[in-house]
Amino acid sequence: MESQTVLPIGREQVLQFRRVLERYSAGLRQTRNRIISSENWWKLRNGTEEQYTQDGGFRSVSGWLHNVIVSKHADLVEGYPEPVLLPREQGDREEARILSAIVPCILEQNQFDTVWSDAMWQKCKTGTACYKIVWDPGKLCGLGDISIQRVNLLNLYWEPGVTDIQKSRFFFHTELCDRDLLQEEYPWLQLKGGDFLDTKFLYDDRVDTENKVTVAEVYYHRRGRLHYCKFVGDQVLFATENQLEPQLDAVGNVLKAPMAETGLYDHGRYPYEFDPLFPIEGSPCGYGYVDVCRSPQTEIDLMKTSFVRNAQVGATPRFFSRQDGAVNEEEFLNLTKPIVHVAGNLGEDSLRQIPVRALDGVYVSLLDRTIDELRQTSGNTETSTGNISAGITAASAIAALQEASGKGSRDTLRSSYRSFGRIVELCVELIRQFYDLPRKFRILGSFGAEEFVSYDNSRLLPVSQGEAFGQDMGLRKPVFDIRIMAQKRNSYTRVTQNELALQLYQLGFFDPARWPQARECLEMMDFEGKDVLLRRLSENAAQPRLPVEAGAAW
């Protein structure tokens, strides 16, 4: 009998992964409960139906917190990022220019506009946005391409106590899959019941998990390489350490070394990016506006509930009635009957109205102060939403107030841009590793003209630096710096930029004869695109000018 090869990842290793997963799940229980609670508040469900009944059938659920999140989401979506890649060496300048045009195309193909919007909802509500950046070999009819998705935090598991997920010993991502579809894809599977199940949000619809099984993906490092294993139950579906054969082309030539040696991705990082709103020490997840504004929102709801009940009592008079009273109660309660019969003399003690004390104005003032506390705490002030106090009419003063009130949103955007920069870094590394065959892209060339380019990773691969003084200088890998620019999607920003250009033109900044004075003035200014404008004016001033004859017409 021929001896069978024992694969590095088998049933015993999967059982170890499952034990680690269950330990991680127990350690992250508090974080997961907070995320679920925040989502419930977003749905304006501050209590259960049983509490509604106990409170008398009504409880006010106002939308002040809802309005805060909607306003913050609008600010974040307005600052949609655009990447610009800058070379670190002069020889990589052209490559950086092409990548700066190609990476936005890849983001557009992944509908990153929608991914960004969904992630910003997630960041405002639960406190953390999470992205998954992987290579999908099934894209483009099997050619493969980069895939960027927003990930549900309840499906992720990492080592409790770490702030950076890259320092976690293992990283898990679980998903519920249909049992029959999984059995069809892997006919040799022997699926069993009682598998590990994810924690889920409280959906409005009834989610049936009876015919679902949990498929888990685990990422881990071994010998400095990033490895990956996909399993269900105690059975391995795929593991990079089990790929012992090199990757071949159609004619049998070796394309790449076995994945057991190279790992999953050359960059060696977990392909996930966390973007917390308000960071927490010892956790990659932060807390969101729901956690900050929960207390004042509860106070507002309680006071409004009391106000409505007091108004109901005042609008519906109630009466004390004696047991031996002479008033016909049925006719008294029937407003359609103009006559109410009584027996004998009608005394004042037969029927007496219950007095209702109207609320004092101090309670309304307290409600207004609580609402103002919520708005000030969240930064969702009237100025930030476009409402300016009476008496302020100057455009510069209004712009200054709005600029000052938006510093909280700008700080949030800066943290999101840092995460987006790391996403672009992973995209560039995936291009470097997998773009062996040329791809076609439509990019914008000079003056907005369409250009169709073919691109592969040949100029991104490490190249030899030769020898110097008898020593091998090793390999050089093109590396790029990433600058993130905000794509402001509002008419006010565009109008302001256009007005600045017109003012510079009217003041003669584009006159080559005034280039020295214009340069001194522009260097003291700060606006978007200043470096490009300085370069163009410098080139324009350096060009030789033909003398203009006297009396020559335009």
PLM feature segments, named:
Residues 285-293:
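Acidic/polar low-complexity segments with low predicted structural confidence
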